[in-house]
Amino acid sequence: MSSVSNDSPPRGFVAVYAFGYVGAYVALITPVATTLALKVAELDPAGKESTLGLVSAIGALFALVSNPLAGALSDRTTSRFGRRRPFIAIGTVVGVAALAIVGFAPSIPVVVVGWALAQLAFNLVLAALQALLPDQIPLVQRARVSAVLGIAQQVSPLVGIGIATGVMATGAGMGPVFVVPGVVGAALLALLVVRLPDRRLEQAKPFVLLDLVKPTPGTGADFGFAWFGRFFVILGFAIYTTYQVYFITDRVGIPTEQVTLVQLAAVLVFSLVLTASAIVSGRLSDRLQRRKVFVYAAVVVVSLGMVLLAFTTTLALFLVAAGVIGVGIGAFFAVDLALITDVLPDQEHAAARDLGVFNIANALPQSVAPAIAPIFLAIGGGGNYTLLFLVAAVLALIGAALIAPIKAVR
């Protein structure tokens, strides 16, 4: 049976699919957005910036390997439970256990081990989730569904930070701050596991490790331009997300104990404008069957938000900048995922593998951003967030420029 859907998905599936996305990202992005930085600051307050960079980079490297490997294996899985369901289930269980290791870690080395395992496990989940788009959603609906998934992904920090803030208010310590969002995420993913109309593959060619790096037949320049375009946009955005906590405390001057409340306000603003932007962009993109013009406009708006952030010193301006970035990134995630699935060379037999390769463009910036950011922060005596976010704006614009040569989509 073909793995590419030409029929509308079952009633209610898109909602369950979106809840699964929320679950995965509540578990994984809550640490990225706030709690991992707080855990590192608790264990190493003097060297928190460089230590966070190290922990984030190692975790991102594990994500880098896990996603395409899981995708290739998922494409070949002949389990009676389907091709995608086993990876979602196993990755979720292991991921929640890994979050517990991070939360209760007594030292930075234990944090590194736990976070690497969490990234590996949840990228098993993400590889399967992304493959459901070409598996279950017809081409003419993909931008709209991508918009819903983009909203789900970006609303997840709001849910996760809200949960983390509530847990922190109880004085329970950092362990439950990691575990509780993970358990909530697992519950949402369990709903998808139960409801997923997963197709069973009757026969598959053997897995060869070389397949991870060997291009899928039909892969052309469009695939490469789409990959590098996303990489640079996400790299600019990753600088914002990775250093948001320290920007709030060091530049805006918010006390550490109030950081999660400020982040909650920022994510609320971010999520509201993102939702509106994603819905409008996704519908227009599907109606017009155009992708690139929406990506260009989205990235310009993201870059404007980064420039505003570069010169921000007050809480009010920080929230405005978060809103501007939300408008742009909402449109970007809504349309770019649809663009990516449009240029996949073999949607029937290698969708998860190729989407896993594309997800490297999501994961690798999480490693590169904390590696390069301290260089710019250190210029001029340290804490140079102005230069850092100007660089982030330029990186995003480079990503938009790389979309232009793509020929398979308009």
Model-assigned labels for residue ranges:
Residues S2-A60, D222-I254:
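Helix-loop boundary and gating motifs at the non-cytosolic
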Residues G47-S50, L139-V148, T260, D346-F358:
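Loop-to-transmembrane helix entry/capping segments in MFS-fold secondary transporters
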Residues K48, R83-R85, M168-V183, A373-A396:
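A membrane-interface helix-boundary motif in multi-pass transporters
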Residues F62-L64, A143-T165, N359-P370:
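Glycine-rich segments within core transmembrane alpha-helices of 12-TM secondary carriers
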Residues S66-F81, A276-R290, L377:
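Helix-to-loop junctions at the C-terminal end of transmembrane segments
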Residues R84-A100, V293-L308:
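Structural signature of the two symmetry-related core transmembrane helices
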Residues G103, A187-L196, L390-R410:
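Multi-pass alpha-helical transporter architecture, strongest
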Residues H349-I379:
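A late C-terminal transmembrane helix in Major Facilitator Superfamily
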